[in-house]
Structures are given as C-alpha cells and as structure tokens.
Amino acid sequence: MLALVRRHKRSKGKSLLDVPCGTGQHLQYIKARFSAEGLDINPKMLAIARKRNPGIKFHRGNMLNFKLPKRFDAITCLFSAIGYMTTTAQLRQAIRNMSLHLTAGGVLIVEPWITPRNFKSGSLHAVLVNKPKLKLARIGRSTAHGRISTINFHYLVATPKTTQYFTESEKFGLFTHSEYLSSLRAAGLKVTYYSKGLIGRGLYVGVKTSQRP
C-alpha cells in the first residue's frame, strides 16, 4: 500500500492521515515512512491507538464531516471502512470530505467493500484462537436486503476465570464499481483501479488534480 502512495503521489510532502484508524495497527508501520496522523469516531478505538502509537496525533471525527486545519499528502481508508456509508449520497460526501483534506497532488487510497454482484448472502466465516489461556471463536453470517449488507457476529470467549458469549451486528453499503468511480471523480480525483487490491476486494487510488474538490 505504501508503495502505491509513493508511486502515485505528486505532492512533495510526507504527511498522511488514516481514516478511520481504528486501534492504530496500520499506523505502527506507516509512521516509519510518513508523518502520520489518525482519525476515528470511536473513543475506545482511539484510546488503544494512542497507547499503541505514542507521539502520533489522533483526532476524533466522522469521515462524513470531519474538519481538520491542515491538508495531507496522503489519506488512507482501508479494510473496507468506506462500506460503513450506506447510501450513495453518504459515499460521495465521505469521499469528497477526504478529498477536501488533500493537498494538490495528494493521493487518496480507498479499499472498497464487496460489490452487490460479488456479495453472497448466507455466507459463513469463522475465526478461531486456541491458546493455553484463551479460547475464542468468532462466527459471522452475511445477509443482504437491497443495497445494505449485514454481518451478524457471534463470539464465544473463554479464559481460566470466565466464559463469555456476545453478539454484534455490522451493516455495510453495497456499491458498484461505477458508483465508486463516479464518487472519486466527482471529488476532483484522477482514479487508478487495482482489481486485486490488498485482499482481493480491489483498491482505488485517486490523485488530487487541484485544490478544488
């Protein structure tokens, strides 16, 4: 991913914003090559990110409407986080807002969620952890209603002291390749698309052609 930033970026600086940054795992590696910052809407995630990356500046905000007093040479939106937008209007607004925070020649990298054509309702996913003092199972089941996909997760976690079971549900918008492209171009970005991407979902690289969105 960092190689793509260097390949496409036309600005001279090395500032980078990770949106959303989650617990800051990406930034552990990014910070060695860029002057990195992170943004996330979840205060608990930000607390972990700050502990993991002391010295990095973090901001609390929503990708739809965050406003920072600076522009960046690169903005990354990875792990299909753009899928938290559930309408095309939100998709366009989030991309436009990130583009507004790019300097001219800066690059926006967006890893998309699964497209409507490729999404398989009823698919199952499992993650298992088997350590001496921790046993964990996470089962996910995917469904779709119209252009909204839902993944229902079931967790079973056991330690020497306790066993817990809990669930959570995540909703993601299903957008076509054309909708991603049009949203990026409408935000003033020249787009290159990599079909394989980082984990097989594709990757959009947009270069800011001017200071106007």
Regions found by a protein language model. Name each.
Residues 67-74:
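A short acidic, Gly/Pro-enriched loop at the edge of an enzyme's catalytic core
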Residues 177-213:
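C-terminal lobe and adjacent flexible extensions of AdoMet/dcAdoMet transferase-like proteins
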Residues 109-181:
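SAM-dependent methyltransferase
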